[in-house]
From Swiss-Prot:
Keywords: ATP-binding, DNA replication, DNA-binding, Early protein, Helicase, Host nucleus, Hydrolase, Isomerase, Isopeptide bond, Nucleotide-binding, Phosphoprotein, Ubl conjugation. It is found in: Host nucleus. The modification Phosphoserine is found at residues 94, 98, 111. It comes from Human papillomavirus type 10. Residues 124-221, 657-681 are annotated as: Disordered. The gene is E1. GO terms for cellular component: host cell nucleus. Gene3D superfamilies: 3.40.1310.10, P-loop containing nucleotide triphosphate hydrolases (3.40.50.300), Zinc finger, large T-antigen D1 domain (1.10.10.510). It holds the Pfam family PPV_E1_C. This is Replication protein E1. The lineage of its organism: Viruses, Monodnaviria, Shotokuvirae, Cossaviricota, Papovaviricetes.
Length: 681
């Protein structure tokens, strides 16, 4: 039985009950301005007390009020969503803007009326998208849908089922009164008004990639053929993928990477995309005046023509120079180029260039680079040999190299012409070979020096000097310093002969008189060694004297003279001394002749009276003369010292060397490799 709570009487009709629709018309008892008596107030107060429970607030199911409340809640929720979307606009992804202006720009989408009053469409700057939508897992694929006047019905949903509400969209809801549960179906009733000129929608292609294929087909015509490159977030990855698709191998398998664009190289591997057909054919001729070798392949693709080149320029160029030059020749931007140097020691890479050069799809100009020939020709492959340490030692000995860093650099430079140097670079023990080679070279040099007398050593050092000089600047400089030449020559003769107590020359004088300049030039010619008193606290500071024919102690002070007077009297005598060498046993040897420069006269100080008989002193009084350009007025170089010794060879009582022109060289040149010297018959 239907019991309608809140109604009195059961004989009323359905229209008179609270569950139906009815119209209530108010009855006006008083008008505005009518006087109100106290009786009326009392009646109102009494009526309020009497009719407290007159209105029934209880709601019965099925009376239709839940539909109105549901509608009100939905409208309130829609208004709240619009307000939140307006406040947090920066968290929503920006509308997509086509970089080639094939669709309407963002300003035109947001304000179609503003676009309508313009005389012509303006090119707008590309807008940066703030946030990316979640991808399906197959890459950042973007598709631009058609733009035009249309009305979108229904709701746009993302892949996770949430409704995609754009800013400024109008939510249109309809009430479904026939629904028993009173709920609204948003999927069928909601929609979005796009506008008069339509809008650009950015969509994500799914795993099948059908929409992406359609877009690439539509943009592959005319000027939009390289739109895919422009839109790609990683343009280089797009070009590398297209290269592997066309040529069947990776671009990185043919090249080595240069991080800097300023690194120079003569050989370059260049791949250019989107070249016009006529230009691609013309580059085969235009590139020839610029290079010594060119290997060019031209293949068609949907972007245009793809040009792959292996080029050896006549002069070394960096990546920026190569890109600018080819951009001018091919009329293609640098963003459509891959430019890297080739792999010079990769057999598969060299074989690829060799095999493709013989095919009909390649055009080759010039002589094949040696790094391709060396790795592909059978004759060159047979010539590859194992590394020989003795050959490296012989090369270091012939070029007078005993420093490890210098030997490593110089020997690597000849790897293109020397098979042993190439084998050295291919070895995994380069550091060990380098250290061993320098050690052996120093041993050979030390043994050769110890075998020679002073006369032979001076002649040997003179043969290493290229060119002839003049001995007169040396004599003129001594006269400028008021040094008598004949007494100096006599003292210098006994100095070279190592006569006891005559094997130390001291050059005394004030500063800037040329003492160190004179001694250093002589020491450089004779290949001597320098010792420094600053290292006197070490037991090994005299070790360089064991490996030299002559020594130099520059700028001796009072403390240094005290040390010499205390510990080095026998060294100045030219007698046998004992030298401590680091990590090696003590060595007993005769001290070589020693040059000393000082600002203190040791002959006038009573503290060093026992050194007076062991020193031969020469005084430099005058400042060293220089020209207006700052150059020394008296040039003391190796050529002048060579001429000085050859000119005064007999006066210095040096032994005459054997006549090599008439009698030939009595001894063969030193060889540290097995085999015999090749002699002519």
């Amino acid at each position: 039985m239907d019991d309608n709570t809140g109604t009195e009487g059961g004989a009323c009709s359905e229209s008179e009950r609270a569950g139906g629709w009815f119209i209530v018309e108010a009855i006006v008892d008083r008008r505005t301005g009518d006087p109100i008596s106290s009786d009326d107030d009392e009646e109102e107060d009494e009526a309020g007390e009497d009719f407290v429970d007159f209105i029934d607030d209880t709601r019965s199911l099925g009376d239709g009020q839940e539909v109105a409340q549901e509608l009100f809640q939905q409208q309130t929720a829609a208004d709240d969503d619009v307000a939140v979307q307006t406040v947090k606009r920066k968290f929503a992804p920006s509308p997509y803007f086509s970089p080639v202006c094939e669709q309407a720009s963002i300003e035109h989408e947001l304000s179609p009326r503003l676009d309508a009053i313009k005389l012509g469409r303006q090119s707008a700057k590309a807008k940066r998208r703030l946030f990316e939508l979640p991808d399906s897992g197959y890459g950042q694929t973007q598709v631009d849908t058609e733009s035009g006047p249309k009305q979108v019905q229904g709701s746009s949903e993302t892949q996770d089922g949430r409704q995609d509400d754009d800013e400024g969209s109008v939510v249109q809801s309809t009430l479904d009164t026939g629904n028993q549960n009173g709920r609204q179906n948003n999927d069928e009733g909601s929609g979005r008004n796009v506008g008069e000129h339509g809008s650009q929608e950015e969509e994500r292609a799914g795993g099948d990639g059908e929409e992406s294929d359609l877009q690439s087909t539509s943009t592959g015509k005319g000027a939009g053929g390289v739109v895919e490159i422009l839109r790609a977030s990683n343009k280089k990855a797009t070009l590398l993928g297209k290269f592997k698709e066309q040529f069947g191998l990776g671009y990185n398998e043919l090249i080595r990477h240069f991080k800097s664009d300023r690194t120079s190289c003569a050989d370059w591997v260049v791949c250019v995309f989107g070249v016009f057909c006529t230009v691609a054919e013309g580059i085969k001729t235009l590139i020839q005046p610029l290079c010594d070798y060119a290997h060019i392949q031209v293949l068609p693709c949907q972007w245009g023509m793809t040009v792959l080149m292996l080029v050896r320029y006549k002069r070394a160029k960096n990546r920026e120079t190569v890109a600018k030059g080819l951009s001018t020749l091919l009329n293609v931007p640098e963003s459509q180029m891959l430019i890297e140097p080739p792999k010079l020691r990769s057999g598969p890479a060299a074989l690829y260039w060799y095999k493709t050069s013989m095919s009909s799809c390649s055009d080759v100009y010039g002589e094949t680079p040696e790094w391709i020939v060396r790795q592909t020709m059978v004759g060159h492959a047979m010539e590859d040999a194992q590394f020989s340490l003795s050959e490296m030692v012989q090369w270091a000995y012939d070029h007078d190299i005993t420093d490890e860093s210098t030997l490593a650099y110089e020997y690597a430079l000849i790897a293109d012409t020397d098979s042993n140097a190439a084998a050295f670079l291919s070895s995994n023990c380069q550091a060990k070979y380098l250290k061993d080679a320098c050690t052996m070279c120093r041993h050979y040099k030390r043994g050769e020096q110890a075998r020679m007398s002073m006369s032979e050593w001076i002649w040997f050092r003179g043969d290493k000097v290229q060119g002839d000089g003049d001995w007169k600047p040396i004599v003129q400089f001594l006269r400028y310093q008021d040094v008598e030449f004949i007494p100096f020559l006599c003292a210098f003769k006994t100095f070279l002969q190592g006569v006891p107590k005559k094997s130390c020359l001291v050059f005394y004088g004030p500063a800037d008189t040329g003492k160190s300049y004179f001694c250093m030039s002589l020491l450089r010619f004779l290949g001597g060694a320098v010792i420094s008193y600053a290292n006197s606290s070490s037991h090994f500071w005299l070790q360089p004297l064991s490996e030299a024919k002559i020594g130099l102690l520059d700028d001796a002070t009072s403390q240094c003279w005290n040390y010499i007077d205390t510990y080095l009297r026998n060294a100045l005598d030219g007698n046998q001394i004992c030298v401590d060498r680091k990590h090696r046993a003590l060595l007993q040897l005769k001290c070589p002749p020693l040059l000393i420069t000082t600002n203190i006269n040791p002959l006038t100080d009573e503290r060093w009276k026992f050194l007076r008989s062991r020193l031969q002193l020469f005084t430099f009084k005058n400042p060293f003369p220089v020209t207006t350009q700052g150059e020394p007025m008296y040039t003391l170089n190796d050529q002048n010292w060579k001429c000085f010794f050859r000119r005064l060879w007999a006066r210095l009582s040096l032994t005459d060397p054997e006549d090599e022109e008439e009698h030939g060289n009595p001894s063969e040149p030193f060889r540290c490799v097995p085999g015999q010297n090749a002699r002519t018959i």
